[in-house]
């Protein structure tokens, strides 16, 4: 997916784009862009005028008509090239994805219980609801949910990430994608998509642009451009009638030529943005694909640019995801060494990052070495969501660690006493944003292990930048309100939702939307699906469940919760690029007006020579210079349209002021200079 990341275009893309530029000259394709269709019709008209001029019927010199005709056709081809080069980047990505999509032999079984009754079928014949078994070394034949087994899966063909991932039944890591490869163990998979409707098929369709529809903003802008074009068309037609009348009144033989008026129309129409509008949208989706995010629609990318509420999961986005033991706090006169020893014993079989960190801290702080967990007199008690405790029975003693309330009930039920000192330590740790794990031995509380969430480096600066952009950040966590408040304050988020439930997230999103906000969020579990379906920008993790992917309007192939911030940047960059180039295109008209209008009417009204502020050589050179600039500026702006305007984390007001200065004022100054330079060059080499 990201093999071409950072490249504008390679030789293969450019060759294919040049070829596609000519293929796109068909009337059906040209009609999809009304502004450029006008240039296309104008090119055909001047071609006819040139052919007629060869037999002596002309209102301008044949060489002048030929020159205008060539430049108009080049303008159409340049617009086609801009769109083709943007599509080419998507096609290159689609080619690599298509290589991963091949027909393989699937091992179909009737059910989990009858896994030995294997029928070999083509993956293309699999239907939704079929059950297949895939063993190490085999390719997953279709999208599905793991209903039994656990295995390492190589998803590099889809995500570009070489490190294998774990896929297993149950939980939020059960979704598998057709085209990936099982590299260890085995999986039994229930197919969740029909042939031709797989995740890979959707990816290929999206990156190729086949499934791309114009967004509401694109449609609105295109309506504006069409309206301006119609106005300029009416003005141009009126000018022809007016020039005939003026020529008769002034006793001049020839009115303004049709070729000159066609050149005027093309120069005044918003051809620059008209030529680049489609490529800007395609390039925006391509940049998202290069970030390993699949957008289900262009509308989702635009919505990302308008988002003003970001709902971010604490784990993995704001914190590193693994809490670490940082301190042993004994109570009731217990020695810290005794607490550390008991905490380590209870964690020897605990494979969670938190459990391993307790073992490491005890070793580093007190030199306590891990013991052999296979000793016959050790019975480990695993953590469950119901008991909220784990521990070990060892040498006629019971050691438990877990949530404060759970351990409190455990100690009291055994006739022990839970001290106020322990409550105070628990409250103090919670107020600091940590997680307290209370450790007890038999009916006595030994103390508390302080687990600390490690805030990711640089997140404070990121949230400060988002605040400058007018975006409010909300941390979503299952922690209690005290812990959540402390972490939120340290990370610098604007608000938080503690003890979050699926219903709570959904309600919060609806409340913000009722107030007129656009909300973005990430999710990976089935319980996230309702909130994802409600959010304006919903990024589902690729490692998540099928329900989450179907509810979201984007899928992050890297399954990185922090990607949401990058998605917002890409969305804003897309909107900025479109707005900036629209401003530049319309501002260009002022300079072209001063180049062409005096040149057209100077024969009828010599006094208009005062408007020739660029001191252009002649009427013909003025028209040529303007029409050449009109074509070349499209080519010059293609890299900007594809890469996007550079985005800065500042307020919308400052961005608007800056872009008006750069692209508004620049759109006036640049053509004045460029048209004058072109005029000098074509005069010097004798074109006119």
UniProtKB/Swiss-Prot annotation:
Pfam families with a match to the protein in the record: E1-E2_ATPase, Hydrolase
Major enzyme class: translocase
Alphabetical keyword list: ATP-binding, Cell membrane, Ion transport, Magnesium, Membrane, Metal-binding, Nucleotide-binding, Phosphoprotein, Potassium, Potassium transport, Translocase, Transmembrane, Transmembrane helix, Transport
Top-rank lineage group of the source organism: Bacteria
Reaction(s) this enzyme catalyzes, per UniProt: K(+)(out) + ATP + H2O = K(+)(in) + ADP + phosphate + H(+)
Binding sites annotated in the UniProt record for ATP: 350, 354, 383-390, 401
Principal place of residence: membrane
EC number of this enzyme: 7.2.2.6
Binding site for Mg(2+): 524, 528
PROSITE patterns per record: ATPASE_E1_E2
Keyword Nucleotide-binding carried by entry: yes
Membrane-related topology note: Multi-pass membrane protein
Transmembrane annotation, as ranges: 37-57, 65-85, 219-239, 262-282, 594-614, 622-642, 668-688
Annotated compartments: Cell membrane
Family: Belongs to the cation transport ATPase (P-type) (TC 3.A.3) family. Type IA subfamily.
Function: Part of the high-affinity ATP-driven potassium transport (or Kdp) system, which catalyzes the hydrolysis of ATP coupled with the electrogenic transport of potassium into the cytoplasm. This subunit is responsible for energy coupling to the transport system and for the release of the potassium ions to the cytoplasm.
Record-linked NCBIfam families: ATPase_P-type, kdpB
Self-association and partners: The system is composed of three essential subunits: KdpA, KdpB and KdpC.
Protein name: Potassium-transporting ATPase ATP-binding subunit
Lineage: Bacteria, Bacillati, Bacillota, Clostridia, Eubacteriales
């Amino acid at each position: 997916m990201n093999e071409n990341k950072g490249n504008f275009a390679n030789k293969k893309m450019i060759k294919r784009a040049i070829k596609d530029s000519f293929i796109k000259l068909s009337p059906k394709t040209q009609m999809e862009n009304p502004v450029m269709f006008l240039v296309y019709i104008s090119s055909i008209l001047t071609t006819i005028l040139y052919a007629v001029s060869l037999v002596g019927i002309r209102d301008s010199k044949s060489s002048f008509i030929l020159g205008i005709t060539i430049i108009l056709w080049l303008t159409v081809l340049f617009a086609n090239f801009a769109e083709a080069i943007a599509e080419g980047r998507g096609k290159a990505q689609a080619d690599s994805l298509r290589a991963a999509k091949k027909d393989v032999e699937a091992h179909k079984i009737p059910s989990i219980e009858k896994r030995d009754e294997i029928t070999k079928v083509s993956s293309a014949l699999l239907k939704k609801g079929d059950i297949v078994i895939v063993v190490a070394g085999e390719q997953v034949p279709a999208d599905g949910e793991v209903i039994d087994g656990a295995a390492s899966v190589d998803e590099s063909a889809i995500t570009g990430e070489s490190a294998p991932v774990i896929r297993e039944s149950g939980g939020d890591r059960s979704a598998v994608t057709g085209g990936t490869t099982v590299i260890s163990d085995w999986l039994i998979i229930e197919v969740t998509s029909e042939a031709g409707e797989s995740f890979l098929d959707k990816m290929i369709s999206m990156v190729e642009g086949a499934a791309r529809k114009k967004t509401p903003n694109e449609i609105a802008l295109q309506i504006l451009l069409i309206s301006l074009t119609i106005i300029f068309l009416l003005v141009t037609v009126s000018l022809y009638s007016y020039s005939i009348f003026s020529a008769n009144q002034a006793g001049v033989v020839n009115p303004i030529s049709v070729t000159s008026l066609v050149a005027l129309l093309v120069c005044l129409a918003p051809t620059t943005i008209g030529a680049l509008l489609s490529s800007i949208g395609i390039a925006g989706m391509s940049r998202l694909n290069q970030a390993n995010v699949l957008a289900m629609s262009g509308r989702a990318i635009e919505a990302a640019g308008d988002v003003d509420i970001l709902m971010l999961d604490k784990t993995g986005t704001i914190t590193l995801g693994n809490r670490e033991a940082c301190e042993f706090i004994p109570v009731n006169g217990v020695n810290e060494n005794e607490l550390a020893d008991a905490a380590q014993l209870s964690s020897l079989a605990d494979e969670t990052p938190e459990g391993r960190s307790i073992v490491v801290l005890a070793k580093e702080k007190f030199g306590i070495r891990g013991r052999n967990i296979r000793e016959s007199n050790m019975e480990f008690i695993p953590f469950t969501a119901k008991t909220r405790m784990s521990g070990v029975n060892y040498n006629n003693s019971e050691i438990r660690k877990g949530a404060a309330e759970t351990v409190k009930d455990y100690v009291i039920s055994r006739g022990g006493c839970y001290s106020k000192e322990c409550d105070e330590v628990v409250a103090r740790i919670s107020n600091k944003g940590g997680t307290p794990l209370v450790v007890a031995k038999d009916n006595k509380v030994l103390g508390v292990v302080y687990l600390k969430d490690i805030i990711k480096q640089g997140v404070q600066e990121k949230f400060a930048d988002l605040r400058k952009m007018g975006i409010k950040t909300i941390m979503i966590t299952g922690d209690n309100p005290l812990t959540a408040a402390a972490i939120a304050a340290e990370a610098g988020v604007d608000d938080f939702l503690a003890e979050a439930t699926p219903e709570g997230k959904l309600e919060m999103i609806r409340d913000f939307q009722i107030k007129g906000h656009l909300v973005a969020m990430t999710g990976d579990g089935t319980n996230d699906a309702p909130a994802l379906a409600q959010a304006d920008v919903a990024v589902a993790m690729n490692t998540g469940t099928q329900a989450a992917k179907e509810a979201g309007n984007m899928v992050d192939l890297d399954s990185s919760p922090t990607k949401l911030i990058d998605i917002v940047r890409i969305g804003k960059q897309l909107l900025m690029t479109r707005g900036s180039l629209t401003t530049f295109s319309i501002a260009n008209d002022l300079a072209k007006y001063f180049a062409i209008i005096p040149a057209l009417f100077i024969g009828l009204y010599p006094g208009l020579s005062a408007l020739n502020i660029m001191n252009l050589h002649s009427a013909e050179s003025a028209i040529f210079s303007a029409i050449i600039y009109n074509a070349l500026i499209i080519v010059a702006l293609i890299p900007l349209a594809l890469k996007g305007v550079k985005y800065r984390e500042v307020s919308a007001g400052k961005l608007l002021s800056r872009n008006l200065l750069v692209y508004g004022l620049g759109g006036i100054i640049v053509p004045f200079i460029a048209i004058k330079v072109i005029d000098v060059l074509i005069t010097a080499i004798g074109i006119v």
